């Protein structure tokens, strides 16, 4: 049986820093300990050696096949610390369904120079953006209420939400009906700039008129799967890789990058409310 898991937290990571642009990495579905995970990790390290990187948003399914057994589980070394040893960056994780197959609470208790996850769902500020991490495996009414309050209280020019499951997806798992009904309207109403996720093992960008752009970066190292692009999908590819986002005062640029460093997709969006319409 899973252990009790703490609920929500806010992490103040920019209390002493003035508002500024921020660039970060995001990917999920990574924790296999196999060569493909190391290939993505090495590609991220090479990219961040040539480009500014503030942190990594880890999008869930952090440990395959069944989470971790505790904070001393050898998987921490084999499937996290070793693959990302060349990255001197903090990781800000979300929980995925495979994490719940083990003791999800251990992922909250574990601490290292790279890993810090204060709660099942939480928020933190980095420069011009505030990030809201959601638990989509157990998306409760309490969590929905927390997210609604947190988004309303935020004064950040940019708001980014991320979790594990996609709201919409062209991959094998497809759309998540509960998130389409509950989460999507909240993101649209709150002026959220992006929703980032994994779960489907591919890279995809969905940018449908009138909705929050959604970026799937499930190419972190687990086995790839087929996809069939749906309406609104502007990029979809079954390939290992990661996302890279740069946010400045008025624009945000998303790049989707393969393990050989090739930028497969790049697009720039204006800040929500800065003369743009959904």
Language model feature labels by segment:
Residues 26, 58, 125-126, 208, ...:
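Generic beta-strand structural signal
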Residues 238-278:
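A short C-terminal boundary segment appended to hydrolase-like catalytic domains
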Residues 18, 45, 64-159, 173-194, ...:
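Extended active-site neighborhood of metal-dependent phosphoesterases/phosphodiesterases
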